[in-house]
Every structure is written in structure tokens, then in C-alpha cells.
């Protein structure tokens, strides 16, 4: 006779960081031994699950406050997620295993975070791979995009009227373009609003759709805009569909460090789901 899988009750909190929503699971005491990729595919859909851009699992770590893992709605595990990391920091304080200032481990490196009243700020890993002015052919047209990795890869396209951006169609074409194979890239559409403010819409790899916000995309867009002289210095204020973010950083030539992503986090609801283990 084959083994029978047992049902496990998983407690979760749904949180949102500027419109990016996540299913948060506290696993620092190793309560759950689950296939988190399958969990994300099962519960991220809105109509048949909880509804979220991804699942964030916080595991125990001996060197930092915890380990951060994020699984996209398609089940793929991402290296990092800016707004997800901000939610994780807030969630860790709520759950009582981190203080208002903390460090945690991600696949992209160690992240610092602090809780400042209504805002959660995370110190990102230093961006890499800055490459402005990449020419690619999309839909039989030549366009110039700019690339940077802010924990995950991002391509940036500046446009004059962001309301008219074909985020899904063009974003998907850029995301899967051979130039960025095999890992692919996120695609950001950016309109400059003033010398310290931009508006960003993002097609997210793994979600495979436009999201209300993308923290690493906001950081990537702000740094590229500053690098090209489209905004002046830091901080850069970023408008997204889900709300406003602030990006701070230090520049030394073409190197950027001390990068902070700052914005609000909301707890939406808590609940439990039954999962076969």
C-alpha cells in the first residue's frame, strides 16, 4: 500500500507593500516541511487561492535574524524582492523574532532593515551590472533600454506618457528577449516627472504580469534615472500604482552603494490553510 499524505494546517499573514501583496509564513521554528513552490502555485491565484504576487517564507538563520525566501506565483524562487523584504521585516517584528533594526539573509545577499514609525526601510545589496544604452529589437522596432541588477535583473525603458505604456505586451517581449537569456529580466517603464520624482510601471518576471509596485524595480529605475542625469541626486521619489516609495543611495562615479528602499507596509489579514504534506 502507498503512503497517505497527511493534512497540515499552515498559519499565514497576508501583507502588502505599496500594492505588492504576499502570503507570509513564519517557519523559523521549522514547523512546516512543505514544497513551497507548489504552495505558491496553489495559493497565489486570487479566485482559487488566497491571492498574492508571491509567498514569503521566513526560516531560521544562525548568522542573522532569519533567512528570507520568496516564491513567485508561478512557483519559481526569486533571489530577492524589495517590497517583499520590507514586508518580511515588518512581519518578523510582529512575530517577535526580530527587533526594529535587523539583518536577514536572501539569495541576493544580506539585507539590513529598520522600522521607522509607519515606514519600513531596507538596505539593499549594492547594484551590479550597470549597462546603459542597450539596443534591442522588439516588435520589429529598435529601442534602447538600460540594465542593472538590484538583487534581481531589471531592464529600464524611458517613455513620455506612462499611461499609454503597453506594459504587458512590450514588458513580456523585453522580459523574454534573447539579450537577457537565460535568466530573463523584469521590465520597467519610466516617466520622469521632475528633477527628483519618477513614475514607474513594472512587468514582473515570475508573476508574468504588471504588478502594483516592484521595490527592486523602483530602485533600478531611480538609479538609472540618476545615472543618466534625468533626476538630480538622491533621494528619488517613485510613484507606482500601489503608492509612493523613496529611494536613497550614494554614488561614486558609476558605483552605487548605501541603497535604501523606503515605504509603507500594511497587514491585510491573517488565516490558516490546509495543505497536504
Language-model-detected regions and their locations in the chain:
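Internal active-site segments that recognize and position negatively charged phosphoryl groups
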Residues: 137-166
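Active-site glycine-rich loop that binds ribose-phosphate moieties when present
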Residues: 126-145, 172
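A glycine-rich beta-to-alpha transition motif near the start of alpha/beta enzyme domains, typified by
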Residues: 2-117, 156-277
Amino acid at each position: 500500500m502507498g503512503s497517505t499524505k497527511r493534512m497540515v494546517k499552515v498559519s499565514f499573514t497576508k501583507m502588502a507593500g505599496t500594492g505588492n501583496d504576499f502570503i507570509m509564513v513564519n517557519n523559523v521554528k521549522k514547523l512546516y516541511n512543505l514544497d513551497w513552490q507548489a504552495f505558491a502555485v496553489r495559493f497565489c491565484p486570487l479566485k482559487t487561492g488566497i491571492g498574492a504576487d508571491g509567498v514569503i517564507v521566513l526560516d531560521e538563520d544562525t548568522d542573522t535574524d532569519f533567512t528570507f525566501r520568496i516564491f513567485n506565483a508561478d512557483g519559481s524562487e526569486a533571489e530577492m524582492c524589495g517590497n517583499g523584504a520590507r514586508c518580511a521585516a515588518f512581519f518578523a517584528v510582529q512575530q517577535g523574532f526580530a527587533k526594529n533594526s535587523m539583518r536577514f539573509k536572501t539569495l541576493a545577499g544580506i539585507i539590513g532593515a529598520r522600522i521607522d514609525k509607519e515606514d519600513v526601510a531596507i538596505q539593499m545589496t549594492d547594484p551590479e551590472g550597470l549597462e546603459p544604452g542597450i539596443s534591442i529589437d522588439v516588435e520589429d522596432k529598435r529601442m534602447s533600454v538600460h540594465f542593472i541588477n538590484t538583487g534581481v535583473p531589471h531592464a529600464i525603458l524611458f517613455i513620455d506618457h506612462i499611461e499609454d505604456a503597453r506594459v504587458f505586451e512590450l514588458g513580456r517581449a523585453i522580459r523574454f528577449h534573447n539579450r537577457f537569456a537565460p535568466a530573463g529580466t523584469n521590465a520597467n517603464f519610466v516617466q520622469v516627472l521632475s528633477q527628483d520624482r519618477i513614475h514607474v510601471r513594472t512587468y514582473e518576471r515570475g508573476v508574468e504580469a504588471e504588478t502594483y509596485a516592484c521595490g527592486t524595480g523602483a530602485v533600478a529605475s531611480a538609479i538609472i534615472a540618476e545615472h543618466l542625469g534625468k533626476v538630480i541626486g538622491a533621494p528619488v521619489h517613485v510613484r507606482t500604482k500601489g503608492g509612493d516609495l523613496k529611494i536613497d543611495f550614494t554614488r561614486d562615479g558609476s558605483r552605487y552603494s548605501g541603497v535604501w528602499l523606503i515605504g509603507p507596509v500594511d497587514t491585510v489579514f491573517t488565516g490558516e490553510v490546509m495543505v497536504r504534506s
